Amino acid sequence: AGRVFAVTIDNQTHALDSETGEKLWFHAGLAEVASLLGAASPAGQAGNVVTAYSSGELVALRVENGRALWADNLSNVRRIDALSSIADIRGKPVIDRGVVYAISHSGRMVAIDLRSGGRIWERPIAGVETPWVAGDFIYVLTVDSQILCLTRDSGRVRWVTQLPHFVNEEKNKYPIIWTGPVLVSDRLVVGGSHGLAMTISPYTGELLGMQPMPAGVSIPPIVAGETLYFLSDNAR
Protein backbone atom coordinates (compact mmCIF):
# COMPACT_ATOMS: atom_id res chain seq x y z
CA ALA A 1 0.00 0.00 0.00
CA GLY A 2 1.07 3.57 -0.57
CA ARG A 3 2.07 5.81 2.28
CA VAL A 4 1.54 9.46 3.16
CA PHE A 5 4.08 11.16 5.42
CA ALA A 6 3.25 14.21 7.51
CA VAL A 7 5.27 16.29 9.98
CA THR A 8 3.45 17.94 12.89
CA ILE A 9 4.32 21.21 14.61
CA ASP A 10 5.50 19.30 17.69
CA ASN A 11 8.19 17.49 15.67
CA GLN A 12 6.56 14.15 14.97
CA THR A 13 6.59 12.31 11.64
CA HIS A 14 3.53 10.18 10.94
CA ALA A 15 3.20 7.52 8.24
CA LEU A 16 -0.37 6.87 7.11
CA ASP A 17 -1.86 4.32 4.73
CA SER A 18 -2.76 6.29 1.59
CA GLU A 19 -6.01 4.35 1.07
CA THR A 20 -7.40 3.94 4.58
CA GLY A 21 -5.69 6.73 6.52
CA GLU A 22 -4.59 4.20 9.13
CA LYS A 23 -1.56 5.27 11.16
CA LEU A 24 1.29 2.86 10.41
CA TRP A 25 4.06 4.33 12.55
CA PHE A 26 5.40 7.59 13.91
CA HIS A 27 8.75 9.06 14.88
CA ALA A 28 9.21 11.73 17.55
CA GLY A 29 11.93 14.35 17.41
CA LEU A 30 13.08 16.73 20.11
CA ALA A 31 10.59 19.31 21.33
CA GLU A 32 11.42 22.92 20.48
CA VAL A 33 10.05 26.01 22.23
CA ALA A 34 10.60 28.48 19.37
CA SER A 35 10.32 27.82 15.65
CA LEU A 36 9.50 29.52 12.37
CA LEU A 37 6.05 29.52 10.81
CA GLY A 38 5.68 26.50 8.53
CA ALA A 39 7.48 23.18 8.30
CA ALA A 40 9.48 21.15 5.80
CA SER A 41 7.86 18.25 3.97
CA PRO A 42 9.75 14.94 4.17
CA ALA A 43 11.70 13.69 1.14
CA GLY A 44 11.80 10.05 0.08
CA GLN A 45 14.00 7.82 -2.06
CA ALA A 46 15.09 4.15 -2.22
CA GLY A 47 12.81 2.99 0.60
CA ASN A 48 13.91 5.78 2.93
CA VAL A 49 12.24 9.00 4.04
CA VAL A 50 14.24 11.97 5.33
CA THR A 51 12.42 14.23 7.74
CA ALA A 52 13.45 17.60 9.19
CA TYR A 53 12.38 19.18 12.47
CA SER A 54 12.33 22.67 13.98
CA SER A 55 14.98 21.49 16.46
CA GLY A 56 17.48 21.27 13.60
CA GLU A 57 17.30 17.46 13.57
CA LEU A 58 17.57 15.68 10.24
CA VAL A 59 16.57 12.01 10.42
CA ALA A 60 16.48 9.20 7.84
CA LEU A 61 13.78 6.60 8.47
CA ARG A 62 12.82 3.32 6.81
CA VAL A 63 9.57 3.71 4.90
CA GLU A 64 8.10 0.35 5.92
CA ASN A 65 8.57 0.58 9.70
CA GLY A 66 9.94 4.01 10.68
CA ARG A 67 13.22 2.63 11.98
CA ALA A 68 15.86 5.37 12.22
CA LEU A 69 18.87 4.78 9.96
CA TRP A 70 20.80 7.85 11.04
CA ALA A 71 20.32 11.28 12.55
CA ASP A 72 22.16 14.58 12.24
CA ASN A 73 21.66 18.05 13.66
CA LEU A 74 21.95 21.29 11.72
CA SER A 75 21.80 23.66 14.68
CA ASN A 76 24.70 26.08 14.89
CA VAL A 77 26.80 26.05 18.05
CA ARG A 78 27.64 29.74 17.54
CA ARG A 79 24.50 31.61 18.52
CA ILE A 80 24.92 35.33 18.01
CA ASP A 81 21.40 36.42 18.94
CA ALA A 82 17.98 35.02 19.81
CA LEU A 83 16.83 34.84 16.18
CA SER A 84 19.91 33.01 14.94
CA SER A 85 19.45 30.45 17.73
CA ILE A 86 16.32 29.13 15.99
CA ALA A 87 17.67 25.99 14.35
CA ASP A 88 14.54 25.29 12.30
CA ILE A 89 14.89 23.40 9.01
CA ARG A 90 11.98 24.87 7.06
CA GLY A 91 13.20 24.19 3.53
CA LYS A 92 12.47 20.65 2.34
CA PRO A 93 15.47 18.30 2.31
CA VAL A 94 16.45 17.37 -1.25
CA ILE A 95 17.64 13.88 -2.21
CA ASP A 96 19.64 13.67 -5.43
CA ARG A 97 21.69 10.69 -6.60
CA GLY A 98 21.93 9.22 -3.12
CA VAL A 99 22.89 12.47 -1.38
CA VAL A 100 20.71 14.51 1.00
CA TYR A 101 21.03 18.30 0.86
CA ALA A 102 19.55 20.38 3.68
CA ILE A 103 19.88 23.86 5.15
CA SER A 104 18.90 25.30 8.54
CA HIS A 105 17.89 28.77 9.67
CA SER A 106 20.73 28.93 12.20
CA GLY A 107 23.48 28.72 9.58
CA ARG A 108 24.40 25.20 8.54
CA MET A 109 24.04 23.63 5.09
CA VAL A 110 25.11 20.03 4.57
CA ALA A 111 25.41 17.25 2.03
CA ILE A 112 24.90 13.82 3.62
CA ASP A 113 25.24 10.33 2.18
CA LEU A 114 21.73 8.86 2.27
CA ARG A 115 22.89 5.32 2.93
CA SER A 116 25.50 5.90 5.66
CA GLY A 117 24.51 9.26 7.15
CA GLY A 118 28.08 10.54 6.78
CA ARG A 119 28.59 14.21 5.97
CA ILE A 120 30.15 14.83 2.57
CA TRP A 121 30.52 18.56 3.11
CA GLU A 122 29.24 21.38 5.31
CA ARG A 123 28.99 25.14 4.76
CA PRO A 124 28.06 28.02 7.13
CA ILE A 125 24.99 29.09 5.15
CA ALA A 126 21.61 29.99 6.68
CA GLY A 127 18.34 29.66 4.80
CA VAL A 128 14.67 28.72 5.08
CA GLU A 129 13.94 27.87 1.44
CA THR A 130 14.37 24.53 -0.34
CA PRO A 131 17.66 24.24 -2.26
CA TRP A 132 17.41 23.56 -6.00
CA VAL A 133 19.74 20.88 -7.36
CA ALA A 134 20.45 20.91 -11.11
CA GLY A 135 23.22 18.88 -12.70
CA ASP A 136 26.50 19.55 -10.91
CA PHE A 137 25.26 22.64 -9.06
CA ILE A 138 23.01 23.65 -6.16
CA TYR A 139 21.19 26.97 -5.94
CA VAL A 140 20.08 28.28 -2.58
CA LEU A 141 18.48 31.44 -1.17
CA THR A 142 19.95 32.65 2.13
CA VAL A 143 18.39 34.58 5.01
CA ASP A 144 20.59 37.50 3.92
CA SER A 145 18.75 37.71 0.58
CA GLN A 146 21.59 36.19 -1.40
CA ILE A 147 21.37 33.62 -4.17
CA LEU A 148 24.32 31.21 -4.04
CA CYS A 149 25.50 28.72 -6.61
CA LEU A 150 27.50 25.85 -5.07
CA THR A 151 29.16 22.84 -6.63
CA ARG A 152 27.26 19.66 -5.87
CA ASP A 153 30.26 17.48 -5.02
CA SER A 154 32.22 19.81 -2.71
CA GLY A 155 29.93 22.71 -1.77
CA ARG A 156 32.36 25.25 -3.21
CA VAL A 157 30.71 28.61 -3.90
CA ARG A 158 30.78 29.42 -7.59
CA TRP A 159 29.00 32.78 -7.48
CA VAL A 160 26.91 34.96 -5.16
CA THR A 161 24.20 37.45 -6.15
CA GLN A 162 22.83 39.93 -3.64
CA LEU A 163 19.10 40.65 -3.91
CA PRO A 164 17.59 43.88 -2.55
CA HIS A 165 16.90 43.84 1.20
CA PHE A 166 14.39 46.69 1.17
CA VAL A 167 11.99 48.38 -1.22
CA ASN A 168 13.62 51.65 -0.14
CA GLU A 169 17.31 50.75 0.15
CA GLU A 170 18.40 54.28 1.06
CA LYS A 171 16.23 54.45 4.18
CA ASN A 172 16.13 50.70 4.93
CA LYS A 173 12.34 50.77 4.77
CA TYR A 174 9.88 48.04 3.79
CA PRO A 175 11.93 44.82 4.02
CA ILE A 176 11.60 42.28 1.22
CA ILE A 177 11.17 38.57 1.90
CA TRP A 178 12.26 36.40 -1.02
CA THR A 179 11.14 32.89 -1.92
CA GLY A 180 12.62 30.31 -4.30
CA PRO A 181 14.65 29.72 -6.33
CA VAL A 182 13.13 27.68 -9.15
CA LEU A 183 15.10 26.82 -12.30
CA VAL A 184 13.19 26.97 -15.57
CA SER A 185 14.43 27.46 -19.16
CA ASP A 186 17.95 28.53 -18.16
CA ARG A 187 16.56 31.04 -15.67
CA LEU A 188 16.56 31.07 -11.87
CA VAL A 189 13.33 32.64 -10.64
CA VAL A 190 12.65 34.13 -7.20
CA GLY A 191 9.55 35.88 -5.93
CA GLY A 192 9.41 38.81 -3.53
CA SER A 193 6.98 40.02 -0.88
CA HIS A 194 7.02 43.44 -2.59
CA GLY A 195 5.27 42.11 -5.71
CA LEU A 196 8.20 41.52 -8.06
CA ALA A 197 9.70 38.33 -9.47
CA MET A 198 13.33 38.34 -10.57
CA THR A 199 15.13 36.15 -13.10
CA ILE A 200 18.82 35.37 -12.67
CA SER A 201 21.36 33.58 -14.86
CA PRO A 202 22.22 30.16 -13.36
CA TYR A 203 25.64 30.37 -15.02
CA THR A 204 26.87 33.76 -13.82
CA GLY A 205 24.36 35.03 -11.24
CA GLU A 206 23.63 38.05 -13.45
CA LEU A 207 20.24 39.70 -12.97
CA LEU A 208 18.32 39.15 -16.22
CA GLY A 209 14.97 40.81 -15.58
CA MET A 210 12.00 41.58 -13.36
CA GLN A 211 8.32 40.76 -13.65
CA PRO A 212 5.57 42.59 -11.71
CA MET A 213 3.14 40.39 -9.77
CA PRO A 214 -0.46 41.25 -8.77
CA ALA A 215 0.73 41.30 -5.14
CA GLY A 216 3.51 39.97 -2.96
CA VAL A 217 4.65 36.35 -3.32
CA SER A 218 5.22 34.27 -0.17
CA ILE A 219 5.56 30.74 -1.58
CA PRO A 220 7.89 29.53 -4.34
CA PRO A 221 6.52 29.28 -7.88
CA ILE A 222 6.05 25.84 -9.44
CA VAL A 223 6.78 24.53 -12.92
CA ALA A 224 4.20 22.39 -14.74
CA GLY A 225 4.91 21.46 -18.34
CA GLU A 226 6.40 24.57 -19.88
CA THR A 227 4.53 27.01 -17.64
CA LEU A 228 5.66 28.74 -14.44
CA TYR A 229 2.89 29.38 -11.92
CA PHE A 230 2.92 31.96 -9.11
CA LEU A 231 0.38 32.31 -6.31
CA SER A 232 0.31 35.87 -5.02
CA ASP A 233 -0.73 36.93 -1.54
CA ASN A 234 -4.07 38.21 -2.85
CA ALA A 235 -4.89 34.70 -4.17
CA ARG A 236 -4.25 35.45 -7.83
Q: PLM ranges: what are they?
A:
Residues 1, 23-46, 71-95, 119-135, ...:
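Extracytoplasmic beta-rich repeat domains
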Residues 186-235:
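C-terminal closing repeat unit and adjoining cap/tail of repeat-based domains
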Residues 137-152, 156-199:
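Loop/turn-rich, solvent-exposed surfaces of beta-rich toroidal or solenoidal domains
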Residues 14, 59, 110, 148, ...:
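WD40 beta-propeller blade core
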Residues 1-28:
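A generic tandem-repeat structural signature
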Residues 17-21, 62-66, 113-116, 151-154, ...:
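Short loop/turn segments that connect beta-strands within beta-propeller blades
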